[in-house]
Amino acid sequence: MSRTLVLVRHGQSEWNLKNLFTGWRDPGLTEQGHAEAKAAGQRLKAAGLKFDIAYTSALSRAQVTCQHILDELGQPGLETIRDQALNERDYGDLSGLNKDDARAKWGEEQVHIWRRSYDVPPPGGESLKDTGARVWPYYLHTIQPHVLREETVLVAAHGNSLRALIMALEGLTPEQILKQELNTGVPIIYRLNADSTVASKEILSA
């Protein structure tokens, strides 16, 4: 038995491919995205993992990724909790815009600040700090208790919701977490100590 938490960013979405701000909008996966999600499941299977429960967001790109992984593991009917607490960062007025068009409208420097600062939200949206303010309490109250009961837990979510979770798990500074890129469909395996601190981290790259 081990206290195991696996984080996976959803496979490539149609809007990732088009370079659009996605946030809480709900585009589907590309063919590549479906393949990435299935490959993530295959790598987890090769690592000998089976899950006790899965969590995902209220957005279909994460839900489909989660299901592909469970299908590859032979666990298609596993209990899966869907909650908007795990949704991507809300990009507000930027949602649906091409990133180049956003730079033309607001200026490259301003868009860079919205994308890469920790606590400056775009108009009508969330900062990474805001995203963490909903993700981390949800993790502590809902997900972590399963891990500490020596269960193996899957979380299939989004680049920024997972970045906020990783920041708190690893005790990273805003500067450190903002430098981290999470590739689509790449599982990150955490083993936790009994006191909930991180014992080890492994990235299952292709």
UniProtKB/Swiss-Prot annotation:
Q: Per its UniProt record, what PROSITE patterns does this chain match?
A: PG_MUTASE (PS00175)
What family is this protein classified in?
Belongs to the phosphoglycerate mutase family. BPG-dependent PGAM subfamily.
Q: Write down the chemical reaction(s) this protein catalyses.
A: (2R)-2-phosphoglycerate = (2R)-3-phosphoglycerate
Question: Gene encoding this chain?
Answer: gpmA
Q: Which UniProt keywords apply?
A: Gluconeogenesis, Glycolysis, Isomerase
Q: What positions does the entry give for substrate binding?
A: 9-16, 22-23, 61, 88-91, 99, 115-116, 159-160
Site positions per UniProt: Transition state stabilizer:
H158
Q: Which GO terms describe its molecular function?
A: phosphoglycerate mutase activity
Question: Under which pathway is this protein filed?
Answer: Carbohydrate degradation; glycolysis; pyruvate from D-glyceraldehyde 3-phosphate: step 3/5
> Which protein, by its recorded name, is this?
2,3-bisphosphoglycerate-dependent phosphoglycerate mutase
Read off the InterPro entries from this record.
His_Pase_superF_clade-1, His_PPase_superfam, PG/BPGM_mutase_AS, Phosphogly_mut1
The positions flagged as active site in the entry are H10, E88
Protein function? Catalyzes the interconversion of 2-phosphoglycerate and 3-phosphoglycerate.
Asked if the keyword Zinc belongs to this entry, the reply reads: no
What interactions and quaternary structure are annotated?
Homodimer.
Q: Which CDD domains match?
A: HP_PGM_like (cd07067)
Q: Determine the domain of life of the protein's source.
A: Bacteria
The keyword Ribonucleoprotein belongs to this UniProt entry's keyword annotation: no
What processes in GO biological process is this protein linked to?
gluconeogenesis; glycolytic process
Per the UniProt entry, the Enzyme Commission number(s) are 5.4.2.11
